[in-house]
Amino acid sequence: MPEGPEVALTADILEKYFKGKTLEYIDFISGRYSKSEPEGYDDFIANLPLKVSNVDTKGKFLWFELFDPNDKSNKWYIWNTFGLTGMWSLFEAKYTRAVLSFDNELMAYFSDMRNFGTFKFSNSEKELKRKLNELGPDFLKNDDIDISKIKKYKQPIVALLMDQKKIGSGLGNYLVAEILYRAKIDPHKLGSNLTDQEIENLWYWIKYETKLAYDSNHIGYMVNLENESSKIGRKNYHPNIHPTEKEFDFLVYRKKKDPNGNKVIADKIIGSGKNKRTTYWAPAIQK
């Protein structure tokens, strides 16, 4: 599942190619929206063409900002979430669901094998701000998050980190597993039971892992933008963090052993019934 770093890098690439370009049409050619169009779609189409002014993200939420060059007060927003398998490309990939047509024959495509990704169209800046305010601070983009709030909650730390509203946003299954392993924290441990030192260490590894995943990431969640990813500069998030690895890699996520040979357990901790989510951890390391 694409997480904060992939979504942020995707937005960087989309902005590089499409900022200042004019969107002429968007068509849903397959998937969940081919029969039932997203909220606001008809009104949005009626206002095209529109020029892209910005592509941005918060956590795992991406949005386009567009305006009418003849009436700059006429602003529109495309909301997008990636779900489990959503990704953007500059070519028509397998499982393409949405096609965005720009001037000068430029195209952007959204593919989604499992169809959990979402779109919404809105001309309300207030509605967008309300959506953004519902999300916690972006773990990749913010240096001053008060994660000591973790101690307020008698919930497993793995659940608190994956909750997009309580502490921060942008972390999912793979990042939380890797962060807790690096921080040597048992994912079952309640937030209220973490020591100040554990929280300080946790915050360091959140910054470290999100930065590393953004800077150099080839784990497969944005393969359709692999070529473009290698050509674009990275923003200097968490400037005081200096990863020693050249590339992000999984140490415990979907592994049977960690790099030192310690057993990795796949544990269902979050959710209930069939919807429980699996996390990976090494009991010999994480206490």
From Swiss-Prot:
> Membrane spanning segments where?
none
Could you name the domain of life of the organism this protein comes from? Viruses
Please give the family membership noted in the entry.
Answer: Belongs to the FPG family.
Q: Which UniProt keywords apply?
A: DNA damage, DNA repair, DNA-binding, Glycosidase, Hydrolase, Lyase, Multifunctional enzyme
Protein name in UniProt: Probable formamidopyrimidine-DNA glycosylase
Q: What is its EC number?
A: 3.2.2.23, 4.2.99.18
Q: Name one GO molecular function term.
A: damaged DNA binding
Q: One of this protein's GO BP terms? A: base-excision repair
The catalysed reaction is:
Hydrolysis of DNA containing ring-opened 7-methylguanine residues, releasing 2,6-diamino-4-hydroxy-5-(N-methyl)formamidopyrimidine; 2'-deoxyribonucleotide-(2'-deoxyribose 5'-phosphate)-2'-deoxyribonucleotide-DNA = a 3'-end 2'-deoxyribonucleotide-(2,3-dehydro-2,3-deoxyribose 5'-phosphate)-DNA + a 5'-end 5'-phospho-2'-deoxyribonucleoside-DNA + H(+)
Q: Name one Pfam family in it.
A: H2TH
Recorded hits in SUPFAM superfamilies, A to Z, give: N-terminal domain of MutM-like DNA repair proteins (SSF81624), S13-like H2TH domain (SSF46946)
**Active site per the UniProt annotation:** P2 (schiff-base intermediate with dna), E3 (proton donor), K58 (proton donor), R277 (proton donor)
* PROSITE patterns per record: FPG_CAT
